[in-house]
Regions:
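Beta/alpha (TIM)-barrel catalytic core signal, keyed to glycine-rich beta->alpha loops juxtaposed to Asp/Glu
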Residues: 1-160
């Protein structure tokens, strides 16, 4: 009721919530208000793919997984499990002659489970690069079908040390 009054009073068209796990969406959708959701989604974290969202928009965030999926240079050595995963992932990309940035953007761009995606950039040049990026076709992405990861210590940056 509070949110509906707020939306009516201030002519708010959309109300969104940032969530970390699929269960939160299930709980929040019990409300009467149509909500948009922002959640982590990328080539290795696909936990939200099968969640039905009623009405609101679906925003993917963490599509680069804090940079881990697009750069092999920033390997986190203090976390052996994460470091091992990152090395394996980038070795696979190298073997397949795929670019991590193009893979990340292609994954969310082709997904029918995502309406929008969010990215962070440090410089205008990075944004221009993203806008002008050539996407891989689905056959290239299908080569990575087995990289999905369920280990929460890898896919949730809040748990990295």
């Amino acid at each position: 009721l509070f949110f509906q009054e707020l939306m009516d009073k201030f002519q708010i068209l959309n109300l969104g919530v940032s969530v970390y796990n699929p269960k939160e969406i299930e709980i929040l959708q019990a409300s009467e208000i149509e909500l948009s959701f922002q959640f982590p989604y990328n080539i290795v974290d696909t936990r939200f793919e099968n969640i039905q969202i009623k009405g609101g928009n679906r925003f993917a965030r963490s599509i680069f997984l804090q940079g881990l999926l697009i750069s092999s240079k920033s390997i986190i050595k203090s976390n052996p499990k994460l470091s091992s995963f990152q090395k394996k992932y980038h070795n696979l990309l190298s073997e397949l002659k795929l670019d991590g940035l193009r893979v990340a953007i292609s994954k969310v761009s082709y997904s029918n489970k995502i309406d929008y995606f969010l990215v962070g950039v440090e410089k205008l040049e990075q944004l221009i690069e993203l806008v002008n990026l050539n996407l891989y076709d689905m056959s290239k992405l299908n080569l990575l079908d087995d990289v999905s990861e369920s280990d929460i210590e890898i896919i949730d940056p809040r748990l990295w040390n």
